[in-house]
């Protein structure tokens, strides 16, 4: 895609009908090459949002983004545990804690994340307060994954082309297709995902997009309490991609042998508070936060093929925590990536 490409005709098309895959890949290629003005970027993103993004558009945009990202080599069977963000719920860092629990159970986790979007403290914010340098290079992330079975990949480090669209996104201040693309642009190109969505209407379209992109097994989930993860308070809607087939169903904490907790019990705070809660969880603290993480880890272990059902997955997750293996993964990752330049983020 030439940097001189004029995307204005594509903006006009996007406002009236879905773009074809070729058109969408051209449009997003222009965005990522810096060939569009902020007004043009905003026009394209909002035209698509108002009309509703299609699977073909999401797959094409993901391909354009993947083609320009700084990749790492991930081992066979590696997975990502991530949410779209944008649920506005301000919970504790559930997917981050889940990543350490799943890694402690022996599944390689290549976690892709960023700073706060829907919570008061995003995964990167909490990890920084836990003493990890989240801005480590792709080479360090790859080495950490190989050595410890877990890594954290900061989105801006691995997606430098996003610098061209970041200011326009910030000015828009609303959800765009990029909230959907983030979980599908893992730099390790993992083929197994537990992905939370900010609205359950996106569960199936995102599952269809991941199928188009070659994922082997994925759960797209949205909690009944509005969270972009599996809820410990309400039933959760799931779109499962497995062996090329997509099925939709609901699950509840009871399916994993876990109690239901009030949503308020998993509300988070600032990065320091959330980091302290995560460390306490890995040290064996009981309660709603632990149960929420065990529930999400149970699903991740099922997706990874390490558990036959949610109850078995929950048992494996508890063992990962209580044996100290999950906590050891945090320590091992910290040793690999070093401390942040500014521990206060």
From Swiss-Prot:
Its cofactor is Mg(2+). Mg(2+) 2 binds at residues 228-229. InterPro entries: Anthranilate_Pribosyl_Tfrase, Glycosyl_Trfase_fam3, Glycosyl_Trfase_fam3_N_dom, Glycosyl_Trfase_fam3_N_dom_sf, Nuc_phospho_transferase. The keyword Hydrolase does not apply. Mg(2+) 1 binds at residues 95, 229. Anthranilate 2 binds at residue 169. SUPFAM superfamilies: Nucleoside phosphorylase/phosphoribosyltransferase catalytic domain (SSF52418), Nucleoside phosphorylase/phosphoribosyltransferase N-terminal domain (SSF47648). GO terms for biological process: L-tryptophan biosynthetic process. GO terms for cellular component: cytosol. GO terms for molecular function: anthranilate phosphoribosyltransferase activity; magnesium ion binding. 5-phospho-alpha-D-ribose 1-diphosphate binds at residues 83, 86-87, 91, 93-96, 111-119, 123. Pathway: Amino-acid biosynthesis; L-tryptophan biosynthesis; L-tryptophan from chorismate: step 2/5. Binds 2 magnesium ions per monomer. Gene3D superfamilies: Nucleoside phosphorylase/phosphoribosyltransferase catalytic domain, Transferase, Pyrimidine Nucleoside Phosphorylase, Chain C. Keywords: Amino-acid biosynthesis, Aromatic amino acid biosynthesis, Glycosyltransferase, Magnesium, Metal-binding, Transferase, Tryptophan biosynthesis. Its EC number is 2.4.2.18. Anthranilate 1 binds at residues 83, 114. It catalyses: N-(5-phospho-beta-D-ribosyl)anthranilate + diphosphate = 5-phospho-alpha-D-ribose 1-diphosphate + anthranilate. Pfam families: Glycos_trans_3N, Glycos_transf_3. It comes from the Bacteria. NCBIfam families: trpD. Homodimer. Catalyzes the transfer of the phosphoribosyl group of 5-phosphorylribose-1-pyrophosphate (PRPP) to anthranilate to yield N-(5'-phosphoribosyl)-anthranilate (PRA). Belongs to the anthranilate phosphoribosyltransferase family. This is Anthranilate phosphoribosyltransferase. The lineage of its organism: Bacteria, Pseudomonadati, Pseudomonadota, Alphaproteobacteria, Rhodobacterales. The gene is trpD.
């Amino acid at each position: 895609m030439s940097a001189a490409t004029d995307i204005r005709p594509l903006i006009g098309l996007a406002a009236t009908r879905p773009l074809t895959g070729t058109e969408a890949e051209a449009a997003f290629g222009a965005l990522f090459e810096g060939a569009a003005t902020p007004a043009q970027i905003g026009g394209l993103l909002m035209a698509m949002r108002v009309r509703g993004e299609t699977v073909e558009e999401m797959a094409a945009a993901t391909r354009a983004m993947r083609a320009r990202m700084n990749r790492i080599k991930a081992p066979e069977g590696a997975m990502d545990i991530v949410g779209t963000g944008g649920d506005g719920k301000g919970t504790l860092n559930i997917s981050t804690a889940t990543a350490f629990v799943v890694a402690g159970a022996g599944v390689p986790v290549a976690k892709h994340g960023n700073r706060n979007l829907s919570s008061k403290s995003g995964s990167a914010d909490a990890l920084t307060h836990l003493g990890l340098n989240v801005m480590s290079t792709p080479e360090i992330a790859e080495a950490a994954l190989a050595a410890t079975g877990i890594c954290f990949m900061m989105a801006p480090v691995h997606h430098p082309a996003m610098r061209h669209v970041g200011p326009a996104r910030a000015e828009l201040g609303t959800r765009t297709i990029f909230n959907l693309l983030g979980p599908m642009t893992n730099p390790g190109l993992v083929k197994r995902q537990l992905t939370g969505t900010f609205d359950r209407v996106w569960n199936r379209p995102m599952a269809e997009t991941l199928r188009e992109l070659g994922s082997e097994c994925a759960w797209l989930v949205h909690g009944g309490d509005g969270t972009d993860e599996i809820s410990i308070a309400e039933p959760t809607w799931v779109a499962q991609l497995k062996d090329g087939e997509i099925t939709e169903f609901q699950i509840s904490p009871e399916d994993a042998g876990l109690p239901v907790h009030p949503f308020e019990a998993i509300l988070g705070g600032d990065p320091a508070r959330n980091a302290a809660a995560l460390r306490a969880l890995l040290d064996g603290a009981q309660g709603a936060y632990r149960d929420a993480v065990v529930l999400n880890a149970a699903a991740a272990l099922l997706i990874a093929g390490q558990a036959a059902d949610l109850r078995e997955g929950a048992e494996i997750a508890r063992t990962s925590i209580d044996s100290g293996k999950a906590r050891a993964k945090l320590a091992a990752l910290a040793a690999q990536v070093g401390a942040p330049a500014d521990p206060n983020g």
